Amino acid sequence: MYDMKALYEAHSVEEAVALRLEHPEAQIIAGGSDVLVQMREGKRAGAELISIYGIDAMRGICIDEDGNIRIGSLTSFSHITRDPIIRKYINVLGEAVDMVGGPQIRNIGTIGGNTCNGVTSADSASTLHAWEAVVELTGKNRSEEHTSELQSLCCI
């Protein structure tokens, strides 16, 4: 069904970064709702994949000590729609991601994948852009973490 060269599974951010450095051509996937469809269509035949689905530290929604709402990039659309923090403070984001596909897609699709995949149907990107979202990026080790405004990384 899927013509892939290899599938690597990361269970920590550090492991994901190490795998990416070791396999620079590999496509990073979380839920895989877009990438796996493209593979099934033959558009990414023979691809290497790095799954970050098992990194629990990248899931969830909370308010940090500075009052910022933090949404892990592996947080599913269905989780975002139901989350009390989102409902109270950014209900429009919950409404936007509730428009994504059907329930199956909302259960597996992630906000990180939706904003990073570069597809025109990125339902969450315009809302995050309007709310001046900031993304956290990391390099080879945690000391290389930095933040960047989403709008500086995307063409919306």
PLM segments and residue spans:
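C-terminal structural segment of proteins
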Residues: M1-S148
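Positively charged, low-complexity/disordered segments
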Residues: H146-I156
